[in-house]
Swiss-Prot record:
It comes from Streptococcus pyogenes serotype M49 (strain NZ131). Pfam families: Formyl_trans_C (PF02911), Formyl_trans_N (PF00551). GO terms for molecular function: methionyl-tRNA formyltransferase activity. This is Methionyl-tRNA formyltransferase. InterPro entries: Fmt, Formyl_trans_C, Formyl_trans_C_sf, Formyl_transf_N, Formyl_transf_N_sf, Formyl_transferase-like_C_sf, GART_AS, Met-tRNA-FMT_C. Keywords: Protein biosynthesis, Transferase. It comes from the Bacteria. The keyword Flavoprotein does not apply. It is an enzyme of class 2 (transferase). It catalyses: L-methionyl-tRNA(fMet) + (6R)-10-formyltetrahydrofolate = N-formyl-L-methionyl-tRNA(fMet) + (6S)-5,6,7,8-tetrahydrofolate + H(+). Attaches a formyl group to the free amino group of methionyl-tRNA(fMet). The formyl group appears to play a dual role in the initiator identity of N-formylmethionyl-tRNA by promoting its recognition by IF2 and preventing the misappropriation of this tRNA by the elongation apparatus. Disulfide bonds: none annotated. The lineage of its organism: Bacteria, Bacillati, Bacillota, Bacilli, Lactobacillales. SUPFAM superfamilies: FMT C-terminal domain-like (SSF50486), Formyltransferase (SSF53328).
Length: 311
């Protein structure tokens, strides 16, 4: 039985971890995940999906704010793991930790060397890519630059958003890891170096990324909305208040960027730099998420054709 240390945080990671837990060839000695966070207006403490799964299986849990130089680092290095598996962990691994095990493998949600970094799925959708994928790669000091063990891809559909693509890629990543790990550990599967000249990056999403730019084409704004749903959610401004936009549809029409060009009891169409978008699901400041019909029956009823949002 191969003894593993698992490191990850979101549901993507938990899906991969569950695959390892269900496989008798592997023993998970401990998991390392991000600290619990206070979320929402009530500041409720939320544990990570990886922690929740580890609790259900009685696995030791480590949650350092920063792994490097921590007491937790000393403890996990003393567990005697053969190797490390990471999947969307969210922190760099100290070289001393990588050197302490026989192998260290990362499940990364992109087709490397494209989209190294922390938000590959967001960028794949926002950039209008036709496919996304997962790469199993060796971990080295440089971020997501290690040799590639295996790759698998899937089409990005017009109906996909970050949430749906995360779910698809988590399953692909789990299966790809379980399929390739035995051959990799036996030496039968030889890793392939990345072409570093082709590397692109997907830095973590900042608040500035969330703001919609209505001067872009309707396809670009549409992709941006999908690439922010369900988190952190794209937004524009209505009378100085933030208006989150969860869903929209491509529409025809012309007008100034951000201008209301169609308003009925059931629809609100906004012009973009090229074409237009029909808003479907929105969330006004201080209100719950709602359909555009409910919005137009409430706060949105004051909007008129010719008004401009986003200012």
């Amino acid at each position: 039985m191969i003894k593993l240390l698992f490191m990850g945080t979101p549901q993507f990671s938990a899906t991969v971890l569950k695959g390892l837990l269900d496989n008798p060839a592997y023993e998970i000695l401990g998991v390392v995940t991000q600290p619990d966070r206070a979320v929402g207006r009530k500041k409720d403490i939320k544990v990570t999906p990886v922690k929740q799964l580890a609790l259900e299986h009685g696995i030791s849990i480590y949650q350092p704010e920063k792994l490097s130089g921590s007491q937790e680092l000393i403890e996990i290095m003393g567990l005697g793991a053969d190797g490390i598996i990471t999947a969307a962990f969210g922190q760099f691994l100290p070289t001393i930790l990588l050197d302490s095990v026989s192998f260290a493998i990362n499940v990364h949600a992109s087709l490397l060397p494209k989209y190294r970094g922390g938000a590959p799925i967001h960028y794949a959708i926002m950039n209008g890519d036709k496919e996304a994928g997962v790469t199993i790669m060796e971990m080295i000091k440089e971020m997501d630059a290690g040799d590639m063990v295996a790759k698998a891809s899937t089409p990005i559909l017009e109906t996909d958003n970050v949430g749906t693509l995360f779910e698809k890629l988590a399953i692909i990543g789990r299966d790809l890891l379980l399929d390739s790990l035995p051959a990799y550990l036996s030496g039968e599967l030889k890793p392939i170096p990345q072409d570093h000249s082709q590397a692109t990056f997907s830095p973590n999403i900042s608040p500035e990324h969330e703001k919609l730019d209505w001067t872009m084409s309707n396809q670009e704004v549409f992709n941006h909305i999908r690439g922010m749903n369900p988190w952190p959610v794209a937004h524009t401004f209505l009378e100085g208040q933030r208006l989150k936009i969860y869903e929209a549809q491509l529409a025809e029409g012309e007008g100034l960027p951000g201008q209301v060009i169609v308003k009925t009891k059931k629809s609100l169409v906004i012009a973009t730099g090229q074409g237009a978008l029909s808003l479907i699901v929105v969330q006004p400041a201080g209100k719950p998420k709602m359909s555009i019909i409910d919005f137009l029956n409430g706060i949105g009823r004051k909007l008129e054709v010719g008004d401009i949002i986003g200012r």
